[in-house]
Curated annotation (Swiss-Prot):
Keywords per UniProt: Amino-acid biosynthesis, Aminotransferase, Cytoplasm, Pyridoxal phosphate, Serine biosynthesis, Transferase
Species per Swiss-Prot/TrEMBL record: Streptococcus sanguinis (strain SK36)
Pfam families: Aminotran_5
Modified residues (N6-(pyridoxal phosphate)lysine): 199
A biological process term (GO) from this entry: L-serine biosynthetic process
Protein known as: Phosphoserine aminotransferase
Localization, UniProt: Cytoplasm
Family as reported in the entry's similarity comment: Belongs to the class-V pyridoxal-phosphate-dependent aminotransferase family. SerC subfamily.
Reactions it catalyzes: O-phospho-L-serine + 2-oxoglutarate = 3-phosphooxypyruvate + L-glutamate; 4-(phosphooxy)-L-threonine + 2-oxoglutarate = (R)-3-hydroxy-2-oxo-4-phosphooxybutanoate + L-glutamate
Subunit structure, as described in the record: Homodimer.
């Protein structure tokens, strides 16, 4: 039985990457050591991290005036690092279009009790259960504000921002965890991009931060580990970094490049997601909660059947049939197909065949 992993993260990795990691696992580059054993100060690892950065710069066309960091703590740590480094003494706006955006805003509010800055809720679609991206008037934004924070892809709710909103000249800070390298964006349209690795970059353990140099603060931050300037000045080696996760990210970057880059990834992702969306649309049994087609995620596709009881039955039977981790997030229920870069087209076709069978048997 073929197993398809629909997990929202940690997620499916390219088989080619796993095989290469397996082949190099015991003896990396004739060093006589595993990658997991390499000193982060060794030439071997220095080559790995520099090549990882070079590949990411090429794939995303990152300008020279941006720094690339490989950090620890997951994207959630960035919820604190961003205001600590960028917002002290100023205003920070938050566009909340999903659960993760709300967590970022909530963390900022908590932090504002201890450092001098003002987090402002720019707009939220929570009252609509995050079924759409909320709109706002850019004139509401103070042009002197530190940043506008948004999430480019909402993994739980299945919405995405492809065309960035106008922000009255204020830098955009984006959580791009679930569609980095899966959809094309211009890096220069952002002040800062951050992304946890465990969806399109590699295994959990490393977080990529891409920050414009003029946003690196010379003022001391609460903690050296949480200071972008210190991390940048030390080439992400201020302390021992997640070496194996960075190595795996490098292999994934190589894989994306070999397949044709981010443009090819987006083309494939739109084909995969398009098949599933088209099937759901023509079905009287399944429904997508996302209100507007242009806001549909190509990475995470939530859907429901006519009842929670049928959802539970679907999840049980789908799991038994090899469609793993397809259950929707506990906060929304239903089902969710996460179709990240490494997820195969055949997996979508097989899922649709299963959905057709389930619909026929339960209508």
């Amino acid at each position: 039985m073929t197993i398809y992993n629909f997990s929202a993260g940690p997620a499916v990795l390219p088989k080619e990457v796993l095989k290469k990691a397996q082949a190099e696992f015991l003896d990396y580059a004739q060093s006589g050591m595993s990658v997991m054993e390499l000193s982060h100060r060794s030439k071997e690892f220095d080559d790995i991290i520099k090549e990882a950065e070079s590949l990411l710069r090429e794939l995303m066309d990152i300008p020279d005036n941006y720094r690339v960091l490989f950090l620890q703590g997951g994207a959630s740590t960035q919820f604190s690092m961003i205001p600590l480094n960028l917002a002290q003494g100023g205003k920070a706006y938050y566009l909340v279009a999903g659960s993760w955006g709300k967590k970022a805003y909530t963390e900022a509010v908590k932090l504002s009790k201890f450092i001098p800055f003002e987090p402002i809720l720019l707009a939220s679609s929570e009252d609509l259960n995050y079924t759409e991206i909320p709109s706002f008037d850019e004139k509401e934004i103070d042009p002197q504000a530190a940043y506008v924070h948004l999430t480019t892809n909402n993994t739980i709710e299945g919405t995405a921002i492809y065309d960035l909103p106008a922000t009255n000249g204020v830098p955009i800070v984006a959580d791009m965890s679930s569609n980095i390298l899966a959809a094309q964006y211009r890096v220069e349209d952002f002040g800062l991009i951050y992304a946890g690795a465990q969806k399109n970059i590699g295994p959990a353990g490393v977080t990529v931060v891409i920050i414009r140099e003029d946003l690196l603060d010379d003022e001391p931050v609460l903690s050296s580990m949480l200071d972008y300037r210190i991390q940048a000045d030390n080439g992400s080696l201020y302390n021992t970094p997640p070496t194996f996760a960075i190595y795996m990210a490098k292999l994934v970057f190589e894989w994306v490049k070999e397949l044709g880059g981010v443009a090819e990834m987006e083309k494939r992702n739109r084909e995969k997601s398009g098949l599933l969306y088209d099937f759901i649309e023509q079905s009287d049994f399944y429904r997508s909660p996302v209100r507007y087609k242009e806001q549909r995620s190509v990475a995470n596709i939530p859907f429901v059947s006519p009842s929670p009881e049928l959802d539970a039955k679907f999840n049980k039977e789908a799991t038994a049939a090899g469609f793993k981790n397809i259950k929707g997030h506990r906060s929304v229920g239903g089902m969710r197909a996460s179709l990240y870069n490494a997820f195969p087209l055949q997996g979508v076709k097989d899922l649709i065949a299963f959905m057709q069978k389930f619909e026929k048997e339960n209508s």
